[in-house]
Amino acid sequence: MNVNVVGHFSCRLCGSDLETSVDLGEHPIVNRLSEKPRQVKKYPMQVGGCKQCGLFQILEPIDALEFYTNYDNGSSVKREPHLHKLLDQLSSILSANAKIIDIGCNDGKFLSHLRETGFTNLIGLEPTKNMSSVAVASGFKVFNTFLDVSTANEIVLSEGKFDCVVIRQVLEHISNLESFGLAIQQLVKPGGMIAIEVPDAQLNFRGPDYALWEEHVNYFTIKSLEFFLRLNGIKLVSSYVSIFSGICLTVLGQKILQESEALDFEPFDNATTDDFLSFKKWSTEFLTFKENVRKEIKSFKEKGVEVVLYGVGSRSSPFLNIMGVNDTLSFAIDDDPRKQGKFLPGSNIEIVSREDGVSRLNGQSLILLGVNEENEEKLIGELSSRSSLIFKSILPPSERLLSAFN
């Protein structure tokens, strides 16, 4: 791992030269599970921090076509108890016939929530063929395309401009923020609303959380997200954080009514500098943290305790890869039948069902919890009859984290 000056990368948010980076090694695409053990392609993961706007970012993103042409990340299987707050906000400021587009609508789950809330004029955009088909089957009109200025213009010609643009768990995936921002400007009416939800990068700094998913190429705090809004003529109305897949940050913005309406702000202030300093600290502490994680897990192994992962996902799998602890695991358990019987890419760790996994456990076992915090207590309660199980989480902000996080 090297922390160094970046010679040839510019920030994809503000365009400034990036000054500091950390090399986390080469890793596979974590959601590309294998039908049988095999060697897979690995990609470099170098992360840079911007001293000017505070955004930290993966420097060389994998081409989006590698992920999203045909992609199975159905949102309907995920519990999202935090959504009621956003739905309440939108219903309090928008009429039932307000024209709303959900960018990256996936299988249409949030569109369905909007429909259940009483909204009637709903459209989605989803680049993956299989997920967009599911949303269409649920009764929604969906544009099966990536969003850029050209497609935004086509959508506006077809549908007109929108009263509200929803962008949930999408902006962190976007490698061309300038083009995406211009497209959003095209879609929303003057005075219209923009709702954005992203993972909160403050969790990475505080956790610390080094489980970087290769699909998440941008890591926003409230300051860098507000910077994105203002660059695109959108003023921040409200923001809040929720427990979901770590911690997520939700903001509601409003497009300025006319170009002459000023958005005075100092783009590079103390808060963005603080974000950069947090990134530098996070970077320089990585090696020590990794060593402590490896020592802690191996200490269980050396005592004859079997080590098993529970929950194969886009946070847990990168954690194992980046920490270099795959060699300590016997197998992984996951409740999703689509994953069972397959193998983790790169490590070739077998994924089994709960019934199969529990039957394999003999004596004391360390269960590394790779499920989100909101699901931990339910899972532990269901396994409480096995007193020989030791539960330790690998995903902040859990209260059951490995000691290395302290």
Where are these regions (language model features)?
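N-terminal juxtadomain amphipathic helix
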Residues: 2-79, 240, 250-252
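General small-molecule cofactor/ligand-binding pocket signal
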Residues: 19, 143, 237-240, 352, ...
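Short aromatic-enriched loop/helix-cap "lid" or pocket-rim segments at secondary-structure transitions
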Residues: 25-26, 33, 205-209, 251, ...
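Short, hinge-like loop/turn segments at secondary-structure boundaries
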Residues: 38, 140-144, 212-215, 256, ...
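Extended interfacial segments that mediate partner engagement and assembly in macromolecular machines
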Residues: 41-134, 139, 143-145, 208, ...
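Conserved SAM-binding loop
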Residues: 88-210, 219-232, 253, 317-319, ...
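Hydrophobic, well-ordered beta-alpha structural blocks that scaffold small-molecule cofactor pockets
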Residues: 89-90, 113, 252, 257-406
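Contiguous mid-protein beta-loop-alpha structural module that forms a pocket-lining wall or clamp
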Residues: 202-276
